[in-house]
Amino acid sequence: MQTLQFLAAPAEAPGISGGQIFGAVTASGAALVAGTGLIIGLKGSDWGPLVINNKRRAAWWGIVTGTIWVAAGGTWAEIANGVGSVPPSLFAGGDFGNPGQGAIALFLTCCAFGPKWGSKTAPPAVIGLAAAVVYGTAGGVWGILVNVVRMLIGIVTGQR
């Protein structure tokens, strides 16, 4: 008597067809890569994506890195929230009144992109990190920016 054997199709291998364009990358992995890229870029790099040679690139790197850190959670979020808690605490309970998170977000954006920082790229990057945290709590157009970055991270990590 002969028996019929069914062979199952192999499981789909991770990769582009599996939705993870860089292989297995988690939110914590994305946070590690973003933080490393920010530090290397600020120290000086000649590789295109990591070249941070002006305030605009430094601020954007800070904003995106801070958003990724918050999305990753854990220690990454604690670092970002620590940096991001400084600007709101300067205005809390003082003689300045309560400007609101939206105004603080606008203030940080002006501070990161407005002044002539010269060759200094660290200040706008740190302000960008703080702004990312405030953007997440401010809502409005600031929340849209944060959600776009988080959606892109979800696509890269395969966690849609």
Label the model's feature ranges.
Residues 1-20, 157-160:
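Short, strongly hydrophobic alpha-helical membrane anchors
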Residues 80-108:
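Alpha-helical transmembrane-segment detector that highlights a single hydrophobic TM helix
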Residues 14-26, 52-53, 88-98:
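Interfacial loop-to-helix junctions that mark the boundaries of transmembrane helices
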Residues 58-79:
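A generic, lipid-embedded transmembrane alpha helix
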Residues 23-49:
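N-terminal signal-anchor/start-transfer transmembrane helix
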Residues 45-62, 117-127:
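Alpha-helical transmembrane segments and their helix-start/interface "positive-inside/aromatic belt" motifs
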Residues 139-160:
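Juxtamembrane boundary at the C-terminal end of a transmembrane helix
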Residues 68-71, 130-140:
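Aromatic-anchored segments of alpha-helical transmembrane domains
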